[in-house]
Amino acid sequence: WNLLKKEIISKLKTVENLTELNFPEDFHDRLISFFSADEKPANKRVTKDIVEFMCEGDVFDIGGSLWRIVCGNGHSPEHCCLYNEEHGVLISGDQAIPRISSNVSVYLANRHDDPLGDWISSCEKLRDTIPNDTLVLPSHQEPFKGLQERMQQLIDDHHAQLNRLRISLKENVQTIDQLRKVMFDRKLSSIDVVLATGETQAHMNYLLHRKEVHKELDSRGAAHYPYPLSSKDT
């Protein structure tokens, strides 16, 4: 986290990164202040000698039972879930939560990536490979069953958000800050604005990667998104 925090602060100090998002000027300093704070639980160090890297498909014997690694992406890189086929249990972490959706964001360090595409693919993988009667143990809220329906619901919810953006963009060319208010039409705290902006950018990157929209920078460097593509861009 400390290394990631330093990279984030470095990126934040590159003003054009925030200018492209069309953030208000005072928000720049507030973001740097948030990531510069040292009193967060996540700042605790993990030493290399207690870290063991896990990969998709690896199997571990834990307490006499075999657990298989199932990786997902989009919320965080290589998010590992643990699946026990014998007992029908999936420790899903943030990859499958019963009533809320994990944040899927573009971060300043990787602002051209397609995390939403990765997230939808990960939801499809869990839907198609884990039995529906599996007991899911999430990192938030209560255990649940019905993983396949829940994964499809998450997929459908993101496609509904994408359609909201498409409809809004057909009416006006907009910036990420404006589109955030289309997706999140309520008052947000400073950190929620960061998360909501990252999620809005993730949805726009999904459309950009599929050539449904394109990006234009104005004289200040703020990004605007015309929709649909003009003939010169096809």
Task: State what each model feature region is.
Residues I62, L82-N84, K215, Y227:
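Conserved hydrophobic "DFG−1" position in protein kinase catalytic cores
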Residues W1-V59, K145:
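Active-site HxH/HxHxD metal-binding segment of metal-dependent hydrolases
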Residues N22-D38, I50-F53, D133, V193-V213:
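Short flexible/disordered coil segments
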Residues I32-E52, L66-L162:
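Metallo-beta-lactamase
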Residues V59, G72-G74, D218:
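Short polar/acidic secondary-structure junctions
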